Each structure stands twice: as C-alpha cells, then as structure tokens.
Amino acid sequence: MILLLDIGNTSIYMGISDGKTIIDTYRMNTEIEKTPDEYYATLKSFFDITQITDLAISSVVPRVTEAFKKIGHKYFHKAPLIVGPGVKTGVNIKTDNPKEVGGDLICDAAAIEHNDKPTLIIDLGTANKFIYVKNKTITGVIISTGIQVSRQALIGNTALLPDIDIITPPKVLGTNTIQCMQSGLTYGTAALIDGLVERIQEEVNEAFDVILTGGLSIIIQDLCKTPMIREPRLVLKGLLNIYLRNN
C-alpha cells in the first residue's frame, strides 16, 4: 500500500492507496515541532502501518517534509517520493518562475491529466488557490486568504468579536454578531469564487470546467452560483498519478 501525504500549513491530508484507487483518507494537524517518531506514532493510531510499503509526499512545509523523509528512511527503509524538481508530473508550468509553484497546485493539476477541456481548479485551504489548467499546463493562478485564516484574523485583531464555528448562517444578512461573521466567511467566500470565475472567463474568453476541492469545499459549494463539480480527494488523486508516473 502507498501512503499519500499532502502536507499543508494547517493540516496533513493523507490517503491509503493500492496503486489503483484511494481506499481511505485521514487528516491530522500540521505541527512544526513534532518529531518524526511522534508523527509515526500518530500514523499508527489511524491505520495498520505495517501495510504501507511506500510514501509519496506533496508539501508546502519544508520542516515537516524533513520529518517524513526521516520516517521513510527509518521505518520503511526507502526515500519517499517528494513532488519537486526532477520528479515527472505530467504537468507543464507556464509561469514566470515555475520553481515557486507549490506541490499541492501541481498535484491538483496532475489529477485531471485525462481532461482535455480547460479547467479551473479551486482549492480551498489555508490559502484559496484558483489554478487554470489547459492542455496539461498551468497557465495562471490566483491566491487569496483562506477561510480559516480570515476567521483567525477577525478574532485575533479585534477586541469584541467572538470565536465562531464556520457554518452557513440561515440568511446572508445576519442579525447577531456570530451570524454576521459566519455570513462574511461563507457567503463572502462563495461571492469571491463567483466573482473571480466571471473575471477569469472575461480574460481567457473560452469555456472551462470548474472543480472545487479542499477541506471546506463541502460548505461552500452550495452557496456558489457557478456550476461546478466537487472533488474532495483531488490533490491525493494527483499525487497518486505522479507516484505511478515515477514507478
């Protein structure tokens, strides 16, 4: 079995694959100070670690990447595949500096390698990423503040605003502080998506599919006016495609 790891700034999204499909997924917090042995112990609490024979990693947190590299060498006696320079991805990158494009964006694009139609991937995470892919090429990206970061900014930089759960309030116009904040985060994100999709459409002047992914996509999808498909495992599917391309 292959352990797929998408290491983000807030959480680590994991999948177990038999090399054909993703069988199960798990999520744990990203903790910079955690040691390789501590991470390994956490992995064992999720699934039978003895079934794992290989690791594939996409990461935007170098320090945690190093921890999992050590796990690979110490416990599995092999180097994990890490998305980066020298790894065959099947994705071309048409940007000013391709090296600065994150592994998670590349995995998202690699997941739609069989889609011949231009596609906008919207990945809602610590940062919201809008990735335009055409002919297996990333041609442009938008990055905005993610919902959790916006929530933390509201709470941390104001004296009177309370902590809140990220849920959809009953109406767009709130009648109490909690609902007002929830509306700004949920309906505000949906409006951001709809507005940027419209502007991208004006710029590219062609029809494209829209795929929504990321941990909070389940909350946001129904609030958007834009027709879209939700694919929560997109980044792991792309990481699996990249792993198979290199093995």
Model-derived regions, located:
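Glycine-rich phosphate-binding loop plus the immediately following alpha-helix
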Residues: E31-T35, V101-G103, D108-A109, E113-D116, ...
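Gly/Thr-rich phosphate-binding beta-strand-loop-beta motif of the actin/hexokinase/Hsp70
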Residues: M1-I23, K117-K136, L154
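N-terminal glycine/serine-rich phosphate-binding loop of ATP-dependent small-molecule kinases
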Residues: M1-L3, I7-V87
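Adenine-nucleotide phosphate-binding core of ATP-dependent small-molecule kinases
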Residues: Y26-M28, P169-E206, P227-M228
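Glycine-rich phosphate-binding loop signature in dinucleotide/nucleotide-binding domains
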Residues: D48-Q51, N115-K117, E203-E206
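Short coil/turn connectors at secondary-structure junctions
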Residues: M1, H77-K78, D116-P118, T126-N128, ...
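Long hydrophobic alpha-helical segments typical of transmembrane helices together
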Residues: E203-N247
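Short beta-strand-loop/turn "lid" adjacent to the catalytic site in phosphate-handling enzymes
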Residues: I49-V101, K136-G140, S144-I147, I178-Q179, ...
